[in-house]
């Protein structure tokens, strides 16, 4: 065999062998791929939400329990007045009730009698009396308007002597200069009692009344029993007069 022939045969064998290797490689698997399976990998990220589907048909389940009542709503506006109802039947005539006040009247009369007795006892023990008149002196000095108010509260009046005996009684109970219930406030030198009646009995001190300063419109009883005109705003003792 010549050298050329040998070379040609070697080339043919090489080509056949290479083709055989190629086919064998295609029919076999790689070393890594043909080994045992590996572990599962981590889950991938969630995909995007799909489009909203159509509303399904109502289910066939049982109805749930009723929920708790809600809060009371605000009061509504007042309604229109209703129509007048029918007149009811006339009621029976009531019976008159008479209240017996006999016992109460008797008790009131007894209390009044007791008060009169107490008042008389006080007047007799703390005052001078002439007949049915009692004269009681205060220990405070005040102008005539307050003197009138004080005697009025005690159900009396400012003492006004009608005669010499009453004048002495007032002098004895006062024991100091005291107002008399006599003025000439309405008409100068026309002296009247506090009810507006002109006085008939007088007992002026010598030279009185002199109306010094044109403001002496009230009268006081001096300690000697004589009278003197003074301003009504001056303060003197008060003698109140009470009648039995």
Swiss-Prot record:
<dbReference type="GO" id="GO:0050766">
    <property type="term" value="P:positive regulation of phagocytosis"/>
</dbReference>
<dbReference type="GO" id="GO:0043129">
    <property type="term" value="P:surfactant homeostasis"/>
</dbReference>
<feature type="compositionally biased region" description="Low complexity">
    <location>
        <begin position="65"/>
        <end position="74"/>
    </location>
</feature>
<feature type="modified residue" description="4-hydroxyproline">
    <location>
        <position position="81"/>
    </location>
</feature>
<dbReference type="GO" id="GO:0032991">
    <property type="term" value="C:protein-containing complex"/>
</dbReference>
<dbReference type="GO" id="GO:0005581">
    <property type="term" value="C:collagen trimer"/>
</dbReference>
<dbReference type="GO" id="GO:0048525">
    <property type="term" value="P:negative regulation of viral process"/>
</dbReference>
<dbReference type="Pfam" id="PF01391">
    <property type="entry name" value="Collagen"/>
</dbReference>
<dbReference type="InterPro" id="IPR016186">
    <property type="entry name" value="C-type_lectin-like/link_sf"/>
</dbReference>
<dbReference type="GO" id="GO:1905370">
    <property type="term" value="C:serine-type endopeptidase complex"/>
</dbReference>
<comment type="subunit">
    <text>Oligomeric complex of 3 or more homotrimers. Interacts with MASP1 and MASP2. Interacts with MEP1A and MEP1B and may inhibit their catalytic activity.</text>
</comment>
<dbReference type="Pfam" id="PF00059">
    <property type="entry name" value="Lectin_C"/>
</dbReference>
<dbReference type="InterPro" id="IPR016187">
    <property type="entry name" value="CTDL_fold"/>
</dbReference>
<dbReference type="GO" id="GO:0001867">
    <property type="term" value="P:complement activation, lectin pathway"/>
</dbReference>
<dbReference type="GO" id="GO:0002752">
    <property type="term" value="P:cell surface pattern recognition receptor signaling pathway"/>
</dbReference>
<dbReference type="GO" id="GO:1903028">
    <property type="term" value="P:positive regulation of opsonization"/>
</dbReference>
<protein>
    <recommendedName>
        <fullName>Mannose-binding protein C</fullName>
    </recommendedName>
</protein>
<keyword id="KW-0106">Calcium</keyword>
<feature type="region of interest" description="Disordered">
    <location>
        <begin position="43"/>
        <end position="99"/>
    </location>
</feature>
<dbReference type="GO" id="GO:0070273">
    <property type="term" value="F:phosphatidylinositol-4-phosphate binding"/>
</dbReference>
<dbReference type="InterPro" id="IPR008160">
    <property type="entry name" value="Collagen"/>
</dbReference>
<feature type="modified residue" description="4-hydroxyproline">
    <location>
        <position position="43"/>
    </location>
</feature>
<feature type="modified residue" description="4-hydroxyproline">
    <location>
        <position position="69"/>
    </location>
</feature>
<feature type="coiled-coil region">
    <location>
        <begin position="108"/>
        <end position="126"/>
    </location>
</feature>
<dbReference type="GO" id="GO:0140374">
    <property type="term" value="P:antiviral innate immune response"/>
</dbReference>
<dbReference type="InterPro" id="IPR018378">
    <property type="entry name" value="C-type_lectin_CS"/>
</dbReference>
<dbReference type="GO" id="GO:0010954">
    <property type="term" value="P:positive regulation of protein processing"/>
</dbReference>
<dbReference type="InterPro" id="IPR051077">
    <property type="entry name" value="Ca-dependent_lectin"/>
</dbReference>
<feature type="disulfide bond">
    <location>
        <begin position="151"/>
        <end position="240"/>
    </location>
</feature>
<comment type="function">
    <text>Calcium-dependent lectin involved in innate immune defense. Binds mannose, fucose and N-acetylglucosamine on different microorganisms and activates the lectin complement pathway. Binds to late apoptotic cells, as well as to apoptotic blebs and to necrotic cells, but not to early apoptotic cells, facilitating their uptake by macrophages.</text>
</comment>
<dbReference type="GO" id="GO:0050830">
    <property type="term" value="P:defense response to Gram-positive bacterium"/>
</dbReference>
<dbReference type="GO" id="GO:0005534">
    <property type="term" value="F:galactose binding"/>
</dbReference>
<dbReference type="GO" id="GO:0006508">
    <property type="term" value="P:proteolysis"/>
</dbReference>
<keyword id="KW-0677">Repeat</keyword>
<dbReference type="GO" id="GO:0005771">
    <property type="term" value="C:multivesicular body"/>
</dbReference>
<keyword id="KW-0175">Coiled coil</keyword>
<keyword id="KW-0964">Secreted</keyword>
<keyword id="KW-0465">Mannose-binding</keyword>
<dbReference type="GO" id="GO:0045917">
    <property type="term" value="P:positive regulation of complement activation"/>
</dbReference>
<keyword id="KW-1015">Disulfide bond</keyword>
<keyword id="KW-0732">Signal</keyword>
<feature type="domain" description="Collagen-like">
    <location>
        <begin position="38"/>
        <end position="96"/>
    </location>
</feature>
